[in-house]
Amino acid sequence: IEGRTKSAYYVGAVTNAYRHALDDAIAGRPLDPVWQREVLQISHRPYSTGFYFGQPGQYTANSAYFAGAEVCAVVEGTAPDGRAVLTQRNKFAVGDTLELVTNTAPPVTFTAQDLRDGDGEALETVPHPMQRFTMPLPCTAAPLSLVRRKLPAETVDIRLECGKIKESRT
């Protein structure tokens, strides 16, 4: 993992994807596409084959970052009633489609429901940074597991016009 100021989410997602990909390769299994999709979810600049096919030259068409998902909450633990205790990182609401990201399995998609504050009062949304709350998760999650939301896909059109690379975003 290279670069500066990589978040815990970035390091965890990349390490998890690489670990599973390496385990598959060593076992002689084909690469599960879920792990390639996983590294596309984190904030990143465009990927390349590097020097795999020889000297690549410089890629200067785009230095913008892309992200396929944002972290909404971090799992702190499990309450006595079995609900997950979480800390908010980005606002989300009941009914939002989320993913539980652990280090042991591919992400699990679920719908946010039954959010509760520290007093057990029902919440429709968790709008405050670092707000502690509880909610049921689709499976057991260890502390520091993440809950994330997929972001709308951005379309990037890169083409050659008059000998120069042109890029447009929608």
Predicted features and spans:
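Extended, alpha-helix-rich binding/interface surfaces that flank or overlap catalytic cores
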Residues: 1
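Surface-exposed amphipathic alpha-helical tracts and adjacent flexible/coil segments at the periphery
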Residues: 4-170
